[in-house]
Regions:
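Mid-length scaffold segments of soluble, non-membrane domains
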Residues: 74-105
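Solvent-exposed loop/turn segments connecting transmembrane beta-strands
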Residues: 42-53, 73-85, 113-114, 118-120, ...
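Transmembrane beta-barrel strands of outer-membrane/channel proteins
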Residues: 38-44, 71-75, 102-108, 141-145
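Repeated loop/turn-to-beta-strand initiation elements of outer-membrane beta-barrel proteins
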Residues: 36, 62-69, 95-99, 135-141
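Outer-membrane beta-barrel "beta-signal"
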Residues: 156-169
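Cleavable N-terminal export/targeting peptides
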Residues: 1-31
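Residue-level signature of outer-membrane beta-barrel architecture
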Residues: 58-62, 89-93, 131, 145, ...
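Outer-membrane beta-barrel architecture
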Residues: 39, 55-59, 86-88, 128, ...
C-alpha cells in the first residue's frame, strides 16, 4: 500500500465541500463530538505479519470544514512506538448506524526491535468501517499504512489491520 488513503482523505473532504452549501465558510472552525478510541491488531511488513500493536487515538472535537483534528499514539510488542497528529474525514449513513472514516496523520516513529522504516518522521493514513451503537460506542475494523513518503532512502512502510472500539466524551 502507498499513500492512497492520504489522498482519499483530502479528496473526500474537498468533494464534501463542493456538494454542500457551506459558502463562504467552508473551512471555518467548528466544534464536533469528541471521541476516544482504542484498537489492537496485527502489523504487516511487506505482506508478512511481524508484530501486534495497540493504538490509542482521540478526536479532539475541533474541525476545519469537513476535516476533524485527531491525535494518537501506538506501541507494538517489539517496543516500536509512533505518535502523531492529523485529520480525519467521516461519512455516516443517514439511514443505518454505519460509518466510514479516512485519516491522514504525520508523526514520529521510535524503532525498538521492529522494522527499519528509514527515519523518525512517518505518515499514517488509513480507512475504517464500523457500526455505531449510539451512546454505548462504536466498533470498527481499520486498515492503515505507515511510511515516510519517500523522504528517506528506505521506505517500505508498515500496514496495520485492527479492531477499534470508540466512545464519545
Amino acid at each position: 500500500m502507498d499513500g492512497t488513503f492520504a489522498v482519499l482523505t483530502l479528496l473526500a473532504g474537498f468533494a464534501d465541500i463542493s456538494i454542500s452549501d457551506c459558502k463562504p465558510n467552508c473551512y471555518a472552525e467548528a466544534q464536533v463530538p469528541q471521541r476516544i478510541s482504542i484498537s489492537a491488531g496485527q502489523v504487516y511488513y511487506q505482506l508478512d505479519q511481524v508484530d501486534t500493536e495497540v493504538y490509542l487515538r482521540k478526536q479532539t472535537g475541533l474541525a476545519f470544514g469537513p476535516w476533524r483534528m485527531v491525535y494518537g499514539a501506538s506501541a507494538t510488542q517489539r517496543r516500536d512506538y509512533w505518535a502523531g497528529v492529523g485529520v480525519l474525514y467521516e461519512a455516516a449513513s443517514k439511514t443505518a448506524p454505519i460509518f466510514a472514516q479516512l485519516h491522514l496523520m504525520s508523526g514520529l516513529y521510535a524503532r525498538g526491535a521492529g522494522e527499519d522504516l528509514g527515519g523518525p518522521i512517518e505518515f499514517r493514513s488509513g480507512i475504517e468501517f464500523g457500526y455505531d451503537f449510539g451512546s454505548t460506542g462504536r466498533l470498527g475494523v481499520s486498515y492503515d499504512h505507515r511510511s515516510n513518503a519517500g523522504i528517506y532512502a528506505t521506505n517500505f512502510g508498515l500496514e496495520t489491520v485492527q479492531l477499534r472500539y470508540s466512545w464519545g466524551l
